[in-house]
């Protein structure tokens, strides 16, 4: 195996501050910091996206031991609304520095930073792995554009990767349909930063802010897109025989919000459905702790970080079987799995948890402990180290073979 430490380059379109872009920025941040803590020399090349209106602060200094290099996009609007990242200077930087790394790890598909990196690394003879994290197969938003990108300039990114990381069997299945050979797929789950959950709030501040007292609280936390199934959740909530219950739909609105609001009004739920917007940091943890149950009725969800974080906050969850979330919850316990697109089943599962609140809270706490053992950052990064070493050993063997 390759000796440690390694010089590892991570290329990701969005990083630490880009909560509005979903789970990948947070996962990449957790992963790179954990690798740095384990003694590796970790560099991140990323862009300056943050949200629809603002950019991340530029920095070229270490972040928790990680050397983060941000490259400004030509247009923040194009990056946010079309996921078209145009980082000034990144391509030249990659051409100049690719050969200085032992291995690289690229995050997300259908983006220019990844294509630039794959091209430069291949030219430099440096192996790389790719973590699509659910982005390999175009399933929502600009599907035709993503397919065209994948068939043209993006095609080589997966094709020339030494390994493709699947975070669940569900994602491995997606990759298989795209022609990625099973032998090229490494099954490694997403990491959680367990240190973030050392002190869990009691949820009192979140409830006080909403003015809901001790009323039953159902929470959805995530991006508002059609794929997340929030419409099914609203219908399921309307079927609950709990007129005092409240539904909190928290997350960055990527276009589905107006439809959710209209549905709530049509069901006479507008006074019981609250949309506080994107929650980050401690506010997110307070919301997860305040909830009696977290519902995540998404489809094509290859992992699902939110249900896992709910368990770490001691809150039971309901997820759908059409996703990697179901794999996670079946491994940890602490929640129920229901058929996707079935509001009645979702409603019954939420009611079951609300009726047996103490039992499910105890199960959620136990599941959170299991989650730490299975998905803790050090555990997952140990698996990544083994993957990197295997790739480098194969790469060295290939270079020794006669032409």
PLM regions with names:
Residues 299:
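Aromatic "clamp/platform" in nucleotide-sugar-dependent glycosyltransferases that forms part
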Residues 259-279:
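Nucleotide-activated donor-binding/catalytic signature segment of Leloir-type glycosyltransferases, i.e.
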Residues 316-320:
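Short hydrophobic beta-strand element within catalytic cores of glycosyltransferases
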Residues 26, 216-239, 344:
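A conserved mid-protein helix/loop that constitutes part of the nucleotide-sugar donor-binding site
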Residues 192, 221, 246-261, 277:
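Glycosyltransferase donor-sugar binding loop
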Residues 331, 336-343, 352-357:
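Conserved acidic donor-binding segment of nucleotide-sugar-dependent glycosyltransferases
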Residues 127-129, 137-160:
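Nucleotide-sugar donor phosphate/pyrophosphate-binding loop at the beta->alpha transition
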Residues 48, 170, 191:
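Carbohydrate-associated surface elements
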């Amino acid at each position: 195996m390759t000796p440690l430490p390694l010089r590892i380059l991570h290329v990701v379109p969005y990083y630490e501050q880009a909560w509005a872009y979903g789970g990948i920025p947070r996962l990449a941040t957790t992963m790179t910091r954990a690798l740095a803590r384990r003694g590796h020399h970790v560099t991140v090349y990323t862009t300056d996206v943050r949200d629809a209106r603002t950019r991340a602060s530029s920095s070229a200094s270490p972040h928790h031991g990680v050397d983060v290099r941000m490259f400004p996009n030509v247009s923040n609007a194009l990056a946010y609304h079309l996921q078209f990242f145009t980082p000034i200077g990144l391509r030249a930087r990659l051409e100049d520095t690719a050969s200085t790394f032992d291995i690289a790890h690229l995050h997300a598909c259908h983006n220019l930073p990844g294509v630039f990196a794959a091209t430069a690394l291949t030219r430099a003879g440096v192996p790389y792995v790719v973590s699509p994290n659910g982005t390999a197969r175009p399933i929502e938003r600009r599907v035709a554009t993503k397919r065209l990108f994948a068939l043209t300039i993006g095609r080589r990114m997966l094709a020339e990767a030494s390994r493709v990381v699947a975070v669940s069997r569900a994602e491995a299945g997606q990759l298989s349909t795209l022609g990625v050979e099973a032998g090229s797929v490494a099954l490694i789950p997403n990491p959680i930063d367990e240190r973030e959950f050392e002190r869990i709030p009691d949820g009192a501040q979140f409830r006080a802010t909403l003015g809901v007292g001790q009323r039953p609280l159902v929470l959805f936390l995530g991006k508002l897109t059609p794929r997340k199934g929030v419409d099914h959740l609203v219908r399921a909530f309307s079927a609950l025989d709990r007129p005092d219950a409240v539904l909190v739909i928290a997350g960055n609105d990527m276009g589905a919000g107006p439809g959710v609001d209209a549905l709530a009004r049509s069901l006479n739920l507008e006074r019981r459905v609250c949309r506080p917007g994107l929650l980050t940091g401690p506010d997110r943890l307070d919301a997860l702790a305040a909830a009696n149950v977290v519902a995540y009725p998404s489809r094509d969800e290859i992992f699902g970080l939110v249900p896992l974080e709910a368990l770490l906050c001691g809150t039971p969850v309901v997820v759908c079987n059409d996703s990697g979330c179901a794999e996670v919850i079946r491994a940890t316990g602490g929640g129920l799995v229901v058929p996707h697109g079935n509001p009645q089943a979702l409603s019954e599962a939420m009611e079951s948890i609300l009726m047996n609140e103490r039992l499910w809270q105890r199960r959620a706490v136990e599941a959170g402990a299991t989650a730490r053992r299975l998905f803790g950052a050090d555990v997952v990064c140990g698996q990544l180290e083994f993957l990197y070493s295997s790739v480098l050993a194969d790469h060295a063997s290939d270079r020794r073979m006669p032409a």
